[in-house]
Amino acid sequence: LTDKPWDARAAAWLVSPFINSPRVMPNHFTALRLLVGLAGAVCFAVGDAPNVAALLIVTSNFLDHADGELARLGNKGSRFGHYFDLASDAVVTIGMFAGIGIGLMQSPLGNWAAIMGAAAGIAVALIFHLRYQMENRHGKSATKQAQWAGFEAEDVLYLIPLVTLSGALVGFLWAAAIGAPLAAIFVTSQYLRSMRTESPQP
């Protein structure tokens, strides 16, 4: 438990009452995470309630840990549940960037906002696809994120409410439009290295 990031520890505490429940399964939390995340993406796209959108995305990001913790602690994991979790992660993250881009089309960025959101979303889609391939070939350890003092890189999403409250969503979109493709290039290089070093199958 001590090796887990802070949000995963909190999620483990949240799901602990349901460990032995036959009615509450990890997929229920995954579905809730997906619905809440998509609601956040839609709110960003509408553009009238960015603070609400940010809170929904943060909640969805936290719930992303609940399904995995319940699966591990309650021995309720399944192959479908794992794929459902991965797909939900991708859909919510891509939807968030696309929603931000659409919502900012009325800003000085104009149509470029949608293009920037699409660029970030496509880059994220590529990252999820390549990480899925690496995990299938080399196990989950191949895609384990680095931690710093109990935080992971993806925890930056918890700062989104500060971004919306400070009116810095345009700057966030710029950072995503540049940073996500750069991250995709890095993950692509990891994937290609893993392909070159993969042991030949007997």
Where are these regions (language model features)?
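A feature for the membrane-embedded catalytic helix bundles of lipid/isoprenoid biosynthetic enzymes
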Residues: 1-16, 86-202
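Short amphipathic alpha-helical coupling elements at transmembrane boundaries
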Residues: 12-20, 68, 72-75, 82, ...
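A generic hydrophobic-helix recognition signal that picks specific residues
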Residues: 18, 57-60, 78, 82, ...
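Juxtamembrane helix-loop boundaries in multi-pass membrane proteins
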Residues: 26, 30, 82, 86-88, ...
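Membrane-embedded alpha-helical segments that form the functional core of polytopic membrane enzymes
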Residues: 26-80
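The feature identifies polytopic integral membrane transport proteins across all domains of life
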Residues: 53-54, 79-82, 141-147
